Amino acid sequence: MSLTRLLIRDFRNIETADLALSPGFNFLVGANGSGKTSVLEAIYTLGHGRAFRSLQIGRVIRHEQEAFVLHGRLQGEERETAIGLTKDKQGDSKVRIDGTDGHKVAELAHLMPMQLITPEGFTLLNGGPKYRRAFLDWGCFHNEPGFFTAWSNLKRLLKQRNAALRQVTRYEQLRPWDKELIPLAEQISTWRAQYSAGIAADMADTCKQFLPEFSLTFSFQRGWEKETEYAEVLERNFERDRQLTYTAHGPHKADLRIRADGAPVEDTLSRGQLKLLMCALRLAQGEFLTRESGRRCLYLIDDFASELDDERRGLLASRLKATQSQVFVSAISAEHVIDMSDENSKMFTVEKGKITD
């Protein structure tokens, strides 16, 4: 699936843009503040319902406008799909697919699997566990049809349980929540464990190519003790949870531990090496999706040249081309991406929110 057409209206500093896109590489070149990252963010928002640089909707809608509008055409092997997203200042969204309203953002996410690589993406490696849980959950969402519903129900039940912890005095009063929570937690943890085991070889192979000087290991931590039933953990920790007023153990505390030569990667790797590792993990995840489902990711890469020398840029470019996926790359100068260009790619120039090809 590739995005063949993109219409942007009143998004960030872009008043209007109508772009015919390449199924291969699409380059967005312009000075800082020109709007090139806004194009990447528009694509991301069309597939996620939210921007990646700000959660405040007022900052995403163009100044003095009431809403942004995004439309796209997705070309699959057999059919074309029209998609659209409108969001106003109150945060109300309207999702349209093939001319009909009432759809969910999760449907857009399923139609447009994408990988985002930005200068801020180091949080996958040096940020808190929530960023690595999101990495695992992206894979589970696209590989397990029941994951999104289970994950949504888990969040709801944890919120209710945490509220109940402020009121109850005996564990028996929590059993109605835990009766629902326990099987969901175990199912989600099983899916995450299966996904991390399934993608382990892809991550190891890609990392070996990108960072051959390090021995990298990946270990999934489910969020409570090994060999212990979650029901036992919840009951045993009731008094502590009640004092904390939140549930201290469970899939909401899971992590994917990443180590280089036995030490945490954030303590061992340089910024350039961390970026290579981040790119390797995103590529491995996209390639695993293709192998498992036949579907390809869109790759969004902001500020391609940052932190990478010529050799590393060339390595990343060659691996991206090998995926045969659609790729969107922003850069300050065309010189940074010209060696990636071929007869199928498109080069866009961005200046003060105006986009030309």
From Swiss-Prot:
ATP binds at G30, A31, N32, G33, S34, G35, K36, T37. Signal peptide: none annotated. The keyword DNA repair applies. It is found in: Cytoplasm. One of its GO terms (molecular function) is single-stranded DNA binding. Transmembrane segments: none annotated. One of its GO terms (biological process) is DNA replication. Keywords: ATP-binding, Cytoplasm, DNA damage, DNA repair, DNA replication, DNA-binding, Nucleotide-binding, SOS response. The keyword ATP-binding applies. GO terms for cellular component: cytoplasm. It comes from the Bacteria. Pfam families: SMC_N. The RecF protein is involved in DNA metabolism; it is required for DNA replication and normal SOS inducibility. RecF binds preferentially to single-stranded, linear DNA. It also seems to bind ATP. Belongs to the RecF family. This is DNA replication and repair protein RecF. It comes from Escherichia coli (strain SE11).
